């Protein structure tokens, strides 16, 4: 038996049973991949007009700059004949499957630093403590089982910890705790406290849980 969500009626019959959500922290910019901006490329190197920048504050990293030039993509874009979408020459194979994917160009954030922008993308708010997208899906749609987490989290590590991610990105916020994601770790114990402690066999642990 599963755990039902709060949405009792759906507009469409669900087709997907599972979702794999990949978040590439520090990945290529969208204007280098899918977001074709010919006017920006044309004005590359020009100063940002006051009509665009307005009164927006700048980050501490840019405080010492006296010039704020526009920066367009250095890569060429090709328009897909069937979908009309544009793809840069960095992703030629992705362009070949343009009919099978959905590219959303209408999303934006006013965050000027990485961490608030990441939290906004994961939760819909720059303020910490809000439920993440996985928690909302668990809350709304439920889960096909009652004995496993609603969703799990895998973090990749390189030579340096460059991912600007923390538990806010998979936290349940003000929703019940069973809607929170469970982080898997590398090594012998991907989930803490599931392995039997030294000197305790499976039968003994079962008796403790049953008691």
Could you tell me what each predicted segment is?
Residues 1-211:
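Ligand-binding pockets and gating/stacking loops
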């Amino acid at each position: 038996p599963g755990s039902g969500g709060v949405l009792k009626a759906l507009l469409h019959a669900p087709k997907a049973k599972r979702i794999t959500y990949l978040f590439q922290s520090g990945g290529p910019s969208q204007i280098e991949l899918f977001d074709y901006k010919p006017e920006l490329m044309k004005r590359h190197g020009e100063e940002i007009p006051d009509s665009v920048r307005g009164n927006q504050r700048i980050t501490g990293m840019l405080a010492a700059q006296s010039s704020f030039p526009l920066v367009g993509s250095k890569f060429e874009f090709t328009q897909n004949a069937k979908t009309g979408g544009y793809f840069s020459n960095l992703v030629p194979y992705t362009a070949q499957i343009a009919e099978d994917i959905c590219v959303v160009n209408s999303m934006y954030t006013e965050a000027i630093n990485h961490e608030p922008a990441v939290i906004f993308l994961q939760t819909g708010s720059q303020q910490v403590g809000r439920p993440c997208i996985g928690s909302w899906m668990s809350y709304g749609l439920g889960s096909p089982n009652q004995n496993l987490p609603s969703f799990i989290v895998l973090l990749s590590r390189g030579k340096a910890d460059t991912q600007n991610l923390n538990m806010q990105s998979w936290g349940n916020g003000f929703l019940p705790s069973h809607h929170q994601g469970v982080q898997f770790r590398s090594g012998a114990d991907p989930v803490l406290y599931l392995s039997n402690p030294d000197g305790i066999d499976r039968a003994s642990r079962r008796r403790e849980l049953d008691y």
